[in-house]
């Protein structure tokens, strides 16, 4: 299993986080933790794991194209 962290800058509301966690899950990743202060315009960090480097690349490609 591969673990990774994705930073979501300038989160305005929970819907922003839900959007990116959904992309990760749809691509086969498992969300382990989300760290966000709850403050508008603050960054959030999504910790996730996936099967291998190939899945990690697919997830990152989808996240970066958003």
Each model region followed by its residue ranges:
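N-terminal targeting/docking segments
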Residues: 3, 13, 32-35
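Short, surface-exposed ligand-recognition loops at beta-strand->loop->(often short) alpha-helix junctions
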Residues: 6-16
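A common structural junction motif
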Residues: 26-29, 61-66
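Intrinsic-disorder/low-complexity, polar/charged segments enriched in Ser/Thr/Lys/Arg/Asp/Glu/Gln
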Residues: 1-5, 43-45
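Short, surface-exposed beta-strand/loop "edge" segments at domain boundaries and coil↔beta transitions
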Residues: 14, 53-58
């Amino acid at each position: 299993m591969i673990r990774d962290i994705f930073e979501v800058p300038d989160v305005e509301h929970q819907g922003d986080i839900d959007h990116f966690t959904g992309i990760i899950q749809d691509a086969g990743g498992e969300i382990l933790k989300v760290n966000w202060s709850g403050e508008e315009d603050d960054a959030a960090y999504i910790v996730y794991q996936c099967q291998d480097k190939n899945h990690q690349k697919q997830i990152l490609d989808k996240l970066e194209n958003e």
